[in-house]
Swiss-Prot record:
SUPFAM superfamilies: alpha/beta-Hydrolases. This is GPI inositol-deacylase. It is a multi-pass membrane protein. It comes from Aspergillus oryzae (strain ATCC 42149 / RIB 40). PROSITE patterns: LIPASE_SER (PS00120). The gene is bst1.
Length: 1102
């Protein structure tokens, strides 16, 4: 006979239609015996299973498994129990004055058969939705795996590393001496050192590894620094006299700590960095450890090089209280997520990021340099590009933090002579890249200054020369810029430009007439040429060498395949005509002694012929594409500007078709440069025909740049072709939809942790609505089907409209804000958090991603549902096997069921108190949450086994309820797992100091109490008053928050679910008549005998 935990269903047409989808099971007999409310309450709390057996008259008679006496339910007319049966005196009534529970037994027969369903079946609608979601997810993952990110052309470095631990940097200098270590790198056979003298004679450089990174990752950079100084620099007297010395590479061993997941760990590392910097500088004051020239000033600053989160640690160090002013003035980071934290699962990491970024923005917003503590600091952020699948390269942008006068972001594919995209690890060892880094550092150091580096403006000029292509508007030039001109001069050759005094083959000079005057020397310019031919004229040409402005381009020949092939690059010059206003002649001097195979192309071109601006929208580009034909009389360089192509979410296909090609031999094959102004990303394609275009432009969730106009230029394509060939060129650009799907993985990977919680919350909301109205707790699959037919589509539609409106509002200028008068005029008008909501997109075009993510989330939820059901089924089978093997169930009594037993209330209270006490002192609350998840899994397994054996409504209700709570907690578990992983790592490295955070007992107490309440097998009471809307509102609020803020502030999802758990605990306590006197009885041990909620079946003693 099926029994309900509380109440009976109410006649409701809507719920009746829901229950009537499944035909009722045939009854085994004509008679159904109903029990009164007290008997049903006892069944709900003790979990006692009832087996129907027929007597001689054919009537159904219940018998408890653990009782030897037959029990017949009293009739409804009975008002009291017999004197020898006092079960009513020891039972706690489910109903309460605050949360009355419906107790009418009417209409039970109509709903009961349809509710005893297996959790495995799902509706056709749910299955179809999951199928479509699986197709979408398959193509997204396939596109991500097959996307075109460029080949791996990195050379393998050669090194002979030696790491010397700084044992003197002990607890006297830092409290982290037992956790972290400081090392010095020495290259074997190159760097002289001994145990007594470390051989420090250069500029100190400190390397900071990233999240779970090793200090040994520095060996490729440090080895190149040692060998370059030994082979090149030390033989150059001019550079030595200019203050260039070797680089002494130090490195910190963070013990592979995970700063990306824990804000306090990030702060601890930054504190240790400042203490290490102070210790490193002190080493140069000790003549026993240093071989520096005593006439040189002692170093007062250290250059920081950080990889991944090491770059964030470097920036954080400058905001700490133990930071020595001006002890750091140069920071170079590689694949560092400056703009946003990689994951937002920890509140500390989100708040720490905000404090760091606010400090840097405020510092650079000061009017006067004396008020800016970072005035002398230069920050260079280098990103690997699309090959980096660990940290989105969009996050490496510092355009929202640092003005162009103090730093910039550049991609490795932009750096001259590198031209390679790199993954998260290869950026630390790639041979071409490490050479560029080290050479740039050697140019910025100056040991004649106490800061060990050149002034900030000079450092920025050097970094731009080494890291930018030279074609950017911010690139440094020897010839001063005069402004934008309508004409330009370009020169391309496959030879190298000679500097003044070099003995090469080609020299380019910009000359002006320089009449000599008496007493005036002719050495003011790099070269003076006399073309008078022996006549009496005194007019000469005074010239400047253009080699410093030379730009390296990848060599593009008919046999070229990749831009990073180890061949001699092309040399290129480009000037606006106004930049040459002071000169009258361009002299190209062929200095070769014998004929050489090569070419030189130079021309003056008009911007109207060389610049094409495509004025079309993204919709037109998506529907029809873009087609451009270049005429045969085109300039050597043609620039195609497409402002509509600015999003990081779309990929494109570019095709270049040459007409009438092959009639004349070309001097070089077409060369294409794809570029974005902010951040500085350039990609080169040699011998170009077909190009897969992907870029890092406007990306989701990125804060706006300090200069809003920086992102308005879109993408530009520079095409170099041989103008001597009489052939037209057709260029076509189309959106690559299949390739664009792969871009969603890196930009929206955390969405798949937030959006599924929206679906789970709406499903559980429907489950509680049906339960409060009918008394039946439907399965998760039924709830999902019901949500798909009602609330879920409406919520996704509302979120889509919200995403479109948010993207539209971000495009309005500050003056269009109707509330702009409320803002203080001294405050920055830029809202750096405006892209934190929902999709984080600044383009209303992508509103359709909301229903796509919702669709995928439904499929993911159903798949995880079946994975969890399979796990519970497996554990249930093992649990049942052990119970039967132990002899608890005999074969002849397999129809009889055991009682859902649990520990006494006193023991459960003590266990919970101990766990909470540990949370407040030693362990983080994330550990207690994991314990709660395990306990809830065990409860779900036991409930599933009892439901399968009992086949009663009460047991099915509780099994479905326990499973849904477990599924909800399972989706919250990843948010807590990362901090738990950091804590476990600290234990492994024998760091037992408790976290200074994550010990808030209130953050876990509701979960612990809810899980403990469910271990008794007690079904949560129904709420039939208006308080039932509170449950619905809490679930709905969790769903909305998951969609709007779930990506940027995922850690709050735990706290919102914690509030929900507190409400459910409140329902339990309200129905059980919780009071302080009862709590006292539990502590004294009396409740263990009287409270049936503990799971024990109490018998009356004779």
């Amino acid at each position: 006979m099926h029994r309900r935990s509380s109440g009976s269903p109410v006649e409701d047409d809507a719920e009746d239609s829901l229950s009537s989808r499944i035909p009722p099971e045939p009854s085994n007999g004509p008679n159904v015996v109903d029990t009164p409310e007290k008997s049903r309450s006892q069944v709900a709390r003790t979990g006692t299973s009832i087996d129907l057996r027929r007597d001689a008259t054919g009537a159904s008679t219940p018998r408890s498994r653990n009782s030897s006496m037959w029990r017949t339910p009293p009739s409804s007319s009975m008002t009291s129990n017999p004197p020898d049966c006092k079960s009513s005196s020891v039972m706690m009534p489910l109903a309460s004055q605050r949360l009355p529970i419906e107790a009418s037994p009417d209409h039970q027969r109509r709903y009961r058969p349809s509710r005893l369903r297996s959790p495995w079946p799902c509706s056709i609608l749910t299955a179809f939705t999951t199928l479509v979601a699986s197709i979408f997810l398959f193509f997204i993952l396939r596109s991500f795996a097959l996307r075109q990110t460029g080949g791996d052309g990195c050379g393998v470095p050669v090194m002979s590393p030696t790491f010397i631990r700084m044992v003197g940097f002990d607890t006297e200098h830092t409290r982290f001496a037992s956790k972290y270590n400081l090392y010095l790198y020495r290259e074997g056979g190159v760097d002289p050192y001994s145990q007594e003298n470390l051989g420090l004679n250069g500029v100190p450089v400190l390397f900071l590894p990233g999240n779970a990174g090793s200090y040994r990752q520095v060996r490729s950079l440090a080895a190149e620094a040692s060998r370059h100084y030994y082979d090149v620099v030390r033989h150059d007297e001019d550079r030595l006299n200019a203050g260039t010395r070797s680089l002494d590479f130090f490195m910190i061993d963070f013990n592979e700590d995970m700063a990306a997941f824990h804000g306090q760990t990030l702060l601890d590392q930054a504190e240790y960095v400042n203490e290490a910097v102070a210790y490193i500088l002190s080493l140069y004051h000790d003549p026993r450890r240093s071989r520096r020239d005593p006439e040189l000033p002692d170093p007062s600053a250290v250059v920081l090089v950080g990889h991944s989160m090491g770059g964030i640690v470097a920036r954080t160090a400058l905001t700490m209280t133990n930071y020595q002013a001006n002890s750091v003035n140069t920071i170079v980071t590689m694949s560092a997520p400056h703009a946003k934290p990689p994951v937002s699962f920890d509140s500390d990491i989100v708040q720490t990021y905000k404090q760091i970024n606010d400090y840097w923005r405020e510092a650079y917003s000061q009017t006067w340099a004396n008020d800016n503590p970072l005035w002398h600091v230069t920050l260079i952020s280098i990103a690997g590009g699309s090959r980096d699948t660990v940290v989105p390269s969009d996050y490496a942008s510092i355009s929202s933090l640092v003005p162009e006068t103090h730093g910039f972001t550049v991609f490795t594919s932009t750096i001259p002579d590198v031209w390679i995209g790199m993954d998260h690890l290869s950026i630390t060892w790639c041979d071409q890249f490490r050479k560029a880094i080290i050479k740039s550092l050697f140019e910025v150091v100056d040991v004649r200054r106490a800061t060990q580096t050149k002034p900030r403006a000079e450092r920025m000029r050097i970094f731009k020369k080494w890291y930018l292509t030279g074609m950017e508007t911010v690139a440094e030039r020897t010839l001063p810029r005069k402004g934008v001109s309508g004409k330009k001069f370009t020169l391309l050759t496959n030879q190298q430009f000679d500097k003044s005094g070099d003995h090469g083959s080609l020299e380019v000079l910009f000359c002006s007439v320089f009449p000599l005057q008496n007493g005036k020397p002719a050495t003011a310019f790099s070269m003076n040429m006399d073309f008078s031919g022996g006549t009496s004229g005194s007019t000469r040409l005074a010239c400047k060498n253009a080699a410093e402005d030379g730009i390296h381009l990848p060599a593009s020949t008919p046999s070229s395949k990749r831009p990073y092939d180890r061949v001699q690059p092309f040399s290129y010059l480009q000037y606006d005509l106004e930049d040459l206003a002071e000169h009258q002649f361009v002299a190209v001097v062929d200095k070769a002694n014998s004929p050489t195979k090569g070419f030189v192309l130079a021309e003056f071109s008009d911007s109207s012929d060389s610049v094409i601006r495509a004025r079309l929208g993204l919709g037109s580009l998506l529907s029809a594409g873009l087609k451009v034909r270049l005429p045969a009389n085109r300039p050597m360089l043609t620039e195609l500007q497409i402002p509509a192509v600015h999003s990081s979410l779309l990929d494109y296909r570019l095709k270049i078709i040459r007409k009438n090609h092959g009639q004349q031999q070309e001097l070089f094959a077409p060369l294409l440069r794809q570029s974005v102004a902010d951040p500085h990303e350039s990609k080169f394609f040699v011998n170009v025909k077909n190009v897969n275009v992907n870029l890092h432009g406007l990306a989701p969730f990125m804060p706006p740049p300090l200069r809003e106009q920086a992102t308005l230029g879109g993408v530009s394509f520079h095409l170099w072709t041989d103008p001597s060939c009489d052939s037209t060129i057709d260029i076509s650009l189309s959106v690559d939809i299949a390739g664009s799907l792969g871009e969603l993985v890196m930009r929206y990977r955390t969405v798949f942790a937030a959006f599924p919680l929206l679906v789970v919350a709406l499903v559980m909301r429907k489950q509680f609505q049906v339960y409060d109205e009918t008394g039946y707790f439907i399965t998760f699959a039924e709830g999902l089907d019901s949500a798909l037919r009602s609330s879920l589509p409406m919520l996704l539609l509302a979120m889509s409209l919200l995403a479109s409106s948010l993207a539209t509002s971000t495009k309005l200028p500050p003056t269009d804000d109707p509330f702009h008068w409320r803002t203080n005029s001294t405050e920055s008008p830029i809202d750096f958090t405006k892209n934190d909501l929902l999709l984080g997109s600044q383009d209303a075009f992508f509103w359709f991603l909301v229903p796509i993510f919702g669709l995928i989330s439904v499929g993911v939820c159903l798949v995880i549902n079946y994975v969890a059901l399979a796990l519970i089924f497996l554990l249930t089978s093992i649990y049942g096997f052990l119970r039967s093997k132990s002899g608890y169930i005999r074969r002849d009594e397999k129809g009889n069921l055991p009682i859902f037993s649990s520990a006494s209330p006193r023991r459960r209270l003590v266990n919970s108190a101990i766990l909470l006490a540990l949370v407040s002192t030693v362990i983080p609350y994330q550990f207690a949450y994991m314990v709660a998840c395990i306990v809830q899994l065990a409860t779900s397994v036991r409930a599933s086994w009892h439901a399968k054996e009992a086949k009663s409504t009460t047991h099915y209700n509780f099994a479905n309820f326990a499973y849904s709570i477990f599924l909800l907690m399972l989706w919250i578990l990843p948010i807590n797992a990362l901090v738990l992983l950091v804590w476990a790592h600290n234990l492994v490295v024998h760091w037992f100091m408790p976290f200074s955070s994550h010990h808030n007992v209130l953050s876990i107490m509701p979960f612990v109490l809810l899980v403990e309440a469910m271990t008794t097998g007690t079904m949560i009471p129904r709420v039939t008053t208006r308080f039932k809307h509170v449950t619905s509102m809490l679930f709905f609020f969790i769903a909305i928050y998951s969609a709007i803020y779930g990506v940027s502030y995922a850690y709050l999802l735990h706290h919102l679910t914690n509030i929900l758990a507190a409400w459910l605990v409140g329902i339990y306590f309200s129905a059980s008549g919780f009071s302080l006197s009862r709590l006292w009885r539990v502590l004294e041990g009396d409740e263990a005998v009287q409270n049936p909620a503990s799971g024990s079946h109490t018998k009356k003693k004779p």
